[in-house]
C-alpha cells in the first residue's frame, strides 16, 4: 500500500468520513484543507430526486451567483449588425459570424461560453459536432441564444453558472474560489439551491434534494447537512 504524503496525512486528520457537516463547517474545513499553491475552485454536487430519462425532468438552466465564480470566462459571440458593437462593449472576447465559424473549425475552441443571436443560428448550427460535445452549443434554455447579446455577455462575465443534471440526476458546478470568504460561498450555494427549487419538475415525486457535497480542486469532499442550507 502506498504511503500517504505529508499533505495527505494532514488532510486525513481533518476529515471524518460518513459525517454530515453544516455548510459553514464544511466550507471552513475545505479552506483549511486547500493546501495547493493556487486558488482552488470550490465545486458543489447536488443529488436530485429526478428521473432524467423523462424529458420534463431533464433539468438545465443558468443562474447568476451574487458573488461570482472567481473564474476568468472567455466568451465568443455569433452575431451581426448593431449587436456586434453591443457584444464588444459588454466584454466579449471575440465576435463574428462566418469568420468565427472558420476559426473554430480550425481548432480555436478556447472559450468557456458561446453566445448567439437568433439570426446567427444558421451559422452556429454547422458547428454542432464541435460545440455540442464540449457543452458550448448555444441554447435558449440557458440564455445563450438571445437577441440581447449585451446582457448575455455581461451575465457570463459576471458569474453566471450554467447547470445541467447528469445521467444520475446530479447537478455539478463551481460556486467560487478558496479565497472567497465563507459567507460569500454559502450565499452562492443557497442561490443555486433556490434556483433548483424554482425549476423542480411537477412530475418529480419523493425527496427532491437528496444529497449535497462540496469539494475543492485538490482537496477532499465533505457531505453537507441539508438542514443547514435553504432547501
Swiss-Prot record:
Keyword presence, Repressor: yes
Q: Which GO terms describe its molecular function?
A: rRNA binding; structural constituent of ribosome; tRNA binding
- InterPro entries cross-referenced by the UniProt entry: Ribosom_uL1_bac-type, Ribosomal_uL1, Ribosomal_uL1-like, Ribosomal_uL1/biogenesis, Ribosomal_uL1_3-a/b-sand, Ribosomal_uL1_CS
Q: Which UniProt keywords apply?
A: Repressor, Ribonucleoprotein, Ribosomal protein, RNA-binding, rRNA-binding, Translation regulation, tRNA-binding
Annotated GO biological processes are:
regulation of translation; translation
Give start-end ranges for the coiled-coil region(s). Answer: none
Q: What PROSITE patterns does UniProt report for this protein, alphabetically?
A: RIBOSOMAL_L1
Can you quote a single GO CC term? cytosolic large ribosomal subunit
Q: Does the keyword Repressor apply?
A: yes
Q: Which Pfam families match?
A: Ribosomal_L1
Question: How does it associate, per the subunit comment?
Answer: Part of the 50S ribosomal subunit.
Q: Which PANTHER family match?
A: 54S RIBOSOMAL PROTEIN L1, MITOCHONDRIAL, LARGE RIBOSOMAL SUBUNIT PROTEIN UL1M
Q: Which NCBIfam families match?
A: rplA_bact
Function field: Binds directly to 23S rRNA. The L1 stalk is quite mobile in the ribosome, and is involved in E site tRNA release. Protein L1 is also a translational repressor protein, it controls the translation of the L11 operon by binding to its mRNA.
Q: Which family does it belong to?
A: Belongs to the universal ribosomal protein uL1 family.
Q: Which HAMAP family match?
A: Ribosomal_uL1_B
**Protein name (record):** Large ribosomal subunit protein uL1
Q: State the organism named in the record.
A: Vesicomyosocius okutanii subsp. Calyptogena okutanii (strain HA)
